[in-house]
Curated annotation (Swiss-Prot):
HAMAP family: CinA_A (MF_00226_A). Belongs to the CinA family. It comes from the Archaea. This is Protein PH0439. Pfam families: MoCF_biosynth.
Amino acid sequence: MVLVLAEIITVGDELLTGNTVDSNSAYIAQRLTEKGFWVRRITTVGDDVKEIENAVREAISRKPEVLIISGGLGPTHDDVTMLGVANAIGRKLKLCEDCLERIKEFYEELHRKGLIDDPTLNEARKKMAYLPEGSEPLNNTEGAAPGAYVEYEGVKIFILPGMPREMKAMLESEVLPRLGERKFVQKKFLAEITDESKLAPILEDTIERFKVKIHSSPKGFGKYIGIIIFAEDDEVIGKVIRYIEGKGIKFREGW
């Protein structure tokens, strides 16, 4: 099975201190997997330009097809993700006029609704309209800060907000449609066996024989072992199941 690789970087001091649980990376990984991408690595860094720059450079050096970065796009002093990415790919930040107008309209709408006192487009708010040179803005339907999409050395880089509602909306509307069709399928099964150590050699043999990926974990208080099979198509998964059943293991689909 040929794997199309993806990586995820989440940004935020609050993630490193444990004050906020990183649900974004789990959601992004799940959606990428459903689209047929193999998430090889998830990295978390703080709100530091150099740390972000280094993490992005290292990810690019591993040549994933897709790199998704989430967090650090807001108006505060420690929202520096765009600058970190720009530095990593050797670009300058450039004002996106369309983004600036969108941000202006966003704050004016909040003011009309009585949610903020001042709609002025101050420097902190203007900062969100600066994107890495050569990037394409990604529309934020749930907040002020635009995302960005840029290709560099064959890697598709998507920069998304850290607020989960904003990130999810942008991922669904702006990112996933650009990624095309799935590259593999996955199916979940319950194996009627209580001892992982007895199942392990069977799975190792199966992985080598069929060139698939298999993840296993105990389920149902030891009554079952849950397995997820990743393969090129349903036909291969069917062959895998029949092969393992030939070793005396019974299955039922789903968890």
